[in-house]
């Protein structure tokens, strides 16, 4: 009987979450905005990549030069590949299966140390 209640509560919780989780709508609404990378980061990446992450799994922290030093030497192609395929505790596409490649790249660039970020062109 306890198992029945556990399954029942899990299904209710999952259903309630599924009804409120619409990543495609969110991603469409931010597409092309000035801070698209920041918004993708805040919605999908922040739990593991914040300066004080909720889920401390050893992911590089936003803006932390030491965390990103070795990764930056590998180049953006490798950073994107690791994001796309997943690496260590990070799931493929950072868990954002609905994100476009461009959105993932913008989120990566947003997380890089400020000094390494590309300067905007006029």
Q: What is each model feature region?
A:
Residues 44-47, 66-67, 73-75:
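Mature, secreted membrane-active peptide modules
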Residues 44-51, 107, 111:
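The canonical Cys-X-X-Cys-His
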Residues 56, 61, 79-106, 111-122:
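Axial heme c-ligation environment in periplasmic c-type cytochrome domains
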Residues 12, 39-42, 84, 93:
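Processing junctions and N-termini across compartments
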Residues 17-40, 56-69:
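Electrostatic cytochrome c docking/interface patches
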Residues 41-44, 52, 75, 86:
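Short pre-active-site segment immediately N-terminal to redox-active cysteine/selenocysteine motifs
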Residues 33, 41, 64, 75, ...:
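Stable alpha-helical elements in mature extracytoplasmic
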Residues 1-34, 110-122:
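Post-cleavage N-terminal segment of exported redox proteins
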């Amino acid at each position: 009987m306890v198992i029945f209640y556990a399954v029942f509560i899990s299904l209710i919780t999952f259903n309630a979450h599924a009804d409120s989780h619409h990543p495609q709508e969110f991603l469409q609404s931010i597409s092309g905005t000035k801070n698209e990378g920041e918004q993708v980061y805040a919605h999908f990446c922040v739990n593991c990549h914040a300066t004080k992450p909720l889920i401390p799994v050893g992911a590089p922290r936003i803006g932390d030069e030491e965390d990103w030093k070795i990764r930056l030497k590998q180049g953006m192609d490798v950073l994107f590949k690791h994001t796309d395929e997943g690496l260590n505790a990070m799931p493929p596409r950072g868990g954002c299966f609905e994100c476009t490649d461009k959105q993932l790249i913008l989120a990566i660039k947003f997380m890089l140390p400020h000094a390494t970020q590309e300067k905007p062109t006029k």
